[in-house]
Structure formats: structure tokens, C-alpha cells
Curated annotation (Swiss-Prot):
The keyword Nucleus applies. Residues 2-47 are annotated as: Hydrophobic. Self-associates forming complexes of several hundred monomers. It comes from the Eukaryota. Involved in transvection phenomena (= synapsis-dependent gene expression), where the synaptic pairing of chromosomes carrying genes with which zeste interacts influences the expression of these genes. Zeste binds to DNA and stimulates transcription from a nearby promoter. This is Regulatory protein zeste. Pfam families: Myb_DNA-bind_5. Residues 151-164 have a biased composition (Low complexity). Residues 1-53, 151-174 are annotated as: Disordered. One of its GO terms (biological process) is positive regulation of gene expression. Residues 31-51 have a biased composition (Polar residues). One of its GO terms (molecular function) is sequence-specific DNA binding. The keyword Transmembrane helix does not apply. It comes from Drosophila melanogaster.
Length: 575
């Protein structure tokens, strides 16, 4: 024990001996059970003293136990829910105190500190019946017991306690609590959070209830270590909460890290287009992909039903699954083992007869699918052609507009320079300040719009005529703005408002263009995906054809074998 706890114990047994004895006798005469007595040292200064309260009676204990059990989810640090906060804890404790004090069986009013202390000790001594004790929760923001340094050292010497044990055999005796008499230590106004000292010796000496005998036997060996751990846990309950949160976060972070570790190389579609990917790149990325996503062609029966989908991770380029060489290699390696010896042919005769019918059906289905796919591809090609024509047309229109805009912009620049000069003259003659100078830089910036606009991309968004209309309208609106801006030459105020409108228009155009570019990219990706699907379908078809051819060969060989057998049988029968 630390010096502080010993000081408290010494003060209790020395100076306040009379008080503690009196409290003990009072409690034991009211009921046969001694639990918590808050006794005052006789020599401590009067202003810091708590009033002397009698011990809890058995009825009061029962009331408190039921209340604790009711609110256990909130007040118990071990079993509480995640979402609780310190305010809910505070309110719950206040509610417990109110319910306890308003209960008919209660003889004396108790305050929150006394009830919390009773909760703590009943948990510590394993007397709280509903759950076996664990670290208890004192960290409710309003009532911090830590400000009163409680030394849980027993004020009564150990021999005296053993006498108590002999007197009340079936009753658990709690050591009496001594508030340390130092005025500096026990000062409710000062918020000094001292450590709570616990004496671990008493825990193992409690008489064993027949109910709890097995528990006690198991726990007695651990009791001292537990009590010390609990003392620390009370001091550090807030820290423990923080640590729990951190641990949870750390675990989550680790899990996320593990998840990301699986896919180390992720190809970003924006960075690498399909054309730029070399074979080496593909081989390099192929090794890094998770095993499940690599498409393996297993058995011909499985492939027909199995639908190949593009993997869910969008940022990995789908081409990374299969290289041209690798895919063919797979097909060849799958086909080779099917060139089987005669003995195996004979073993598989019945199976193969069925399989041929299946294979023919599959081949027909595949042929239909292939035809559909080709039709789709043709449609796609036509659509793309149409879109390209639209793009060219729109680009021509836009080039024309840009030329117009540049001419208008040049005119506008001249007009603005004239206007600026006029405004400067106005400023020199009349001393009224105008905002010309602050507005001028934005004016010159705004006139550069038409050159900066990379318009031809915009049409790619929808391969239809209305996009052309949109572009022409935006372009014309820009040019209108420019001319109006030039016309408002007279004073600086109209000039600045026009520039504001112009910069807004410019921004709008920029965003429209960005949107169009993104749509174009989206379409490119979609067509890329379709192309890949088409390639897969074609490859599968090749594979199926090959398998079918081999099967047909097998069956022809079988037919020959059967014919030879028949001939032999006939010879045998004739002979």
C-alpha cells in the first residue's frame, strides 16, 4: 500500500477510533449485517465533514441491488452499451438516488456518493448478486468519487475482524471506511483526482456463502491480483474506455489494411488505356490479382452454363485477367488430356454417347449466341460510325463558332481598353472612386475564354444531334456576353457586373465540357467492356468447336471399333 492509504488508515484507527466504533455499533444494532459505515475521524476539521449516516439495512441493500440490476447496462463499465455517454450515466445515477430515497423501506436519505460507494464495494466484495464483480464504473462526470481520496484500508485491525467473523457466521462483514482526516486531502471544492487505494487483504477473508462457495473457491487464488487490477481500473476507467475505442479502431484499420493488401497492384483505368498496356504489363498484373478472379475454363459441361462476368473491382482493368498467349495455352492444355487411349474409350462408351448429344445442343446454342453477338457488334459499329459523323459535324460547327468568338473578343478587348481609359479620366477629374481597377484583371481574363475552350470533345457525350444544338447555344451565349460587355463601356460599375456574369458563364461552359468528357470516357469504358465480353464469347466458341470436333473423332473411332467387334463376332459365329 502507498503512504497515502496508510496515512488514512492510521488516522482512522488513531484519531477517529471512537467515531468508528460508534458507527459500527450503531449499524450492528440496527441490523445484524455490517456493510458500509462512513465514519468521521474525531479530530478532522468540522467544515469538511460528511454527516454521520447509519449503515445500510438489509431491506435497503435489496432495494439498491434491484436498482443496480435495473440500470446495470448503463452504470456498469463492463456490460454497458457502446452508445451511452457521460450524461446518460449521470442521469441514471441521479435517478437511482431519487428512486432509493423515495422508497418506503429506506430509513435514512443517502446522497449519490454514498450510494456509488456502496455499489463499488458490493461489487468489489462479490456481494452484488446478479453478476460476479469486475471493474466498476465510477467515472460519472458529476460525481467523481476520486476527489475524496477513499482509502479502503480496513480501520479495524485484523484480529478484530476475525472476531466479527466468529460472531456472525452467515453474515459478510465489510471493513469500515474511514475518510482520511487531512483537510488538504479531503476537500470537496478542489477537484484534485487522487488515486483510490484498495487493500487487497480483506477480499480473500470474506466468509463464504453456501450459494457462492464454488465461485469463491475458484476466485480466492486470484483475489489479490484482481483487487489490485480493480483499483487500477477505477483510477483508469476513462483511460480504459479510450484504449478500447483505440483498439477497436486499430482492429478495423488492420482489417482494412489486410483487405487492401490482397490487391497490391491496381490498374487505374484513367492512367492506363487498353491500347497502352503491353504484354509484360498484363503478365505483371496478372500475378497480383486475387486467385478467385482469374477465369479458369474447367470442364466443357461447366463452361456452357457458367456466365463470365467482369470482376467487381472497377479500377482493375479487365484485360488483366487473361493474356492472349495464356488463354490459348489454357485451351490447349485443357484439350490435350481428352485425346484418350482405346481402353479408356471403351470404358466411357455410354457417357460419350450422351455427351455428344449435349455437345451438339451446346454448339447450336453457342452458334446462336455467336450470331446474336455479331449482330450486336454490327449495331455497335453502326452506332459508333453515326456518333463519329455527329462529332465531325459538331466539331466543324464549333470551329466556326470559335472563329466568330475570337473576332468578337478582339472587338470587345478594344472597346474595353477605351472604356478603361475613359474611366481613368473620370477618376482623375471627379474624385469619386469607381471599381474599375479591381475589375480590370478579371475583364482581361474573361476575354481569353474562347481560346481556352477545348470544345470538340463535348459532343462525344451523346452520339445524337441534340448535343450539337447544346454546344451551339452555349457558344452563342458566350459571344453575346462578350459583345454586351464591350458595349457597356461608359462607367466601371456596369463593366464589373458584366465581368461577373461572364466569369459565371465561363465556369458553366467549363463544367459542361467536363461533363461531356466524362460521359465520353464512360461510353468508351462500356464499349471496352462489351468488346472484352465479345472476345471471351468468341474464344469460348473456338474452344467448344474444338471440343466438339474431338468428340466427333472419338465417336467415329468407337464406331469403327464396334464394327470390327461385330465383324469378329460374325466370324466367330460363322466358324
Amino acid at each position: 500500500m502507498s503512504a497515502q492509504g496508510e496515512g488514512g488508515g492510521a488516522g482512522g484507527s488513531g484519531g477517529g477510533g471512537a467515531g468508528s466504533d460508534g458507527g459500527g455499533n450503531a449499524g450492528q444494532s440496527s441490523t445484524g449485517s455490517g456493510t458500509v459505515a462512513v465514519t468521521n475521524g474525531g479530530n478532522s476539521s468540522a467544515k469538511n465533514q460528511l454527516p454521520l449516516t447509519p449503515r445500510f439495512t438489509a431491506e435497503e441493500k435489496e432495494v439498491l441491488y434491484t436498482l443496480f440490476h435495473l440500470h446495470e447496462e448503463v452504470i456498469d463499465i463492463k456490460h454497458r452499451k457502446k452508445q451511452r455517454n457521460k450524461y446518460s450515466v449521470r442521469e441514471t445515477w441521479d435517478k437511482i438516488v431519487k428512486d432509493f430515497n423515495s422508497h418506503p423501506h429506506v430509513s435514512a436519505m443517502r446522497n449519490i456518493k454514498q450510494i456509488q460507494k456502496f455499489w463499488l464495494n458490493s461489487r468489489l466484495r462479490k456481494q452484488y448478486p446478479y453478476r460476479d464483480g469486475s471493474s466498476s464504473n465510477l467515472s460519472s462526470g458529476s460525481a467523481k468519487i476520486s476527489s475524496v481520496s477513499v482509502s479502503v484500508a480496513s480501520a479495524v485491525p485484523q484480529q478484530q475482524q476475525q472476531q466479527h467473523h466468529q460472531q456472525h457466521d452467515s453474515v459478510k462483514v465489510e471493513p469500515e471506511y474511514q475518510i482520511s482526516p487531512d483537510a488538504s486531502e479531503h476537500n470537496p471544492q478542489a477537484d484534485t483526482f487522487d488515486e483510490i487505494e484498495m487493500d487487497a487483504n480483506d477480499v480473500s477473508e470474506i466468509d463464504e456463502d453456501p450459494m457462492e462457495q464454488q465461485q469463491q473457491q475458484q476466485q480466492e487464488a486470484q483475489a489479490q491480483a484482481q483487487a489490485q487490477a480493480q483499483a487500477q481500473a477505477q483510477v483508469q476507467s476513462a483511460a480504459a474506455e479510450m484504449q478500447k475505442m483505440q483498439q477497436v479502431n486499430a482492429v478495423a484499420a488492420a482489417a482494412a489494411a489486410n483487405a487492401t493488401m490482397i490487391n497490391t497492384h491496381q490498374i487505374n483505368v484513367d492512367q492506363i488505356s487498353a491500347e497502352k498496356l503491353t504484354l509484360n504489363d498484363l503478365l505483371h498484373f496478372k500475378t497480383a490479382r486475387p486467385r478467385e478472379e482469374i477465369i479458369l475454363i474447367k470442364h466443357p459441361e461447366a463452361t456452357a452454363t457458367q456466365i463470365h462476368t467482369i470482376p467487381t473491382q472497377a479500377q482493375q482493368h479487365p484485360m488483366a485477367t487473361i493474356t492472349a498467349g495464356g488463354y490459348n495455352q489454357q485451351i490447349i492444355s485443357e484439350i490435350k488430356p481428352q485425346q484418350i487411349t482405346l481402353a479408356q474409350y471403351q470404358a466411357q462408351q455410354q457417357q460419350q454417347a450422351q455427351a455428344q448429344a449435349q455437345a451438339q445442343a451446346q454448339a447450336q446454342a453457342q452458334a446462336q449466341a455467336q450470331a446474336q453477338a455479331q449482330a450486336q457488334a454490327q449495331q455497335l459499329a453502326q452506332q459508333q460510325l453515326a456518333a463519329a459523323q455527329h462529332q465531325q459535324l459538331a466539331a466543324a460547327v464549333q470551329v466556326h463558332h470559335q472563329q466568330q468568338q475570337q473576332q468578337q473578343a478582339a472587338v470587345a478587348v478594344q472597346q474595353q481598353q477605351a472604356a478603361a481609359a475613359a474611366a481613368v479620366k473620370m477618376q482623375l477629374t471627379a474624385a469619386t472612386p469607381t471599381f474599375t481597377f479591381s475589375a480590370l484583371p478579371t475583364v482581361t481574363a474573361a476575354t481569353t475564354v474562347p481560346a481556352a475552350v477545348p470544345v470538340p470533345v463535348a459532343t462525344a457525350s451523346s452520339g445524337s444531334a441534340n448535343s450539337v444544338a447544346v454546344n451551339t447555344s452555349t457558344a452563342s451565349s458566350v459571344s453575346i456576353n462578350n459583345t454586351s460587355l464591350g458595349g457597356g463601356g461608359g462607367n466601371g460599375a456596369t463593366n464589373s457586373s458584366a465581368t461577373a456574369a461572364d466569369s459565371f458563364e465561363e465556369r458553366m461552359n467549363y463544367f459542361k465540357i467536363r461533363e461531356a468528357e466524362l460521359r465520353c470516357k464512360e461510353q468508351q469504358l462500356a464499349t471496352e467492356a462489351k468488346r472484352i465480353e465479345l472476345n471471351k464469347a468468341q474464344d469460348e466458341l473456338k474452344y467448344m468447336k474444338e471440343v466438339h470436333r474431338l468428340r466427333v473423332e472419338e465417336l467415329t473411332m468407337k464406331i469403327r471399333i464396334l464394327q470390327k467387334e461385330e465383324e469378329q463376332l460374325r466370324k466367330c459365329s460363322t466358324s
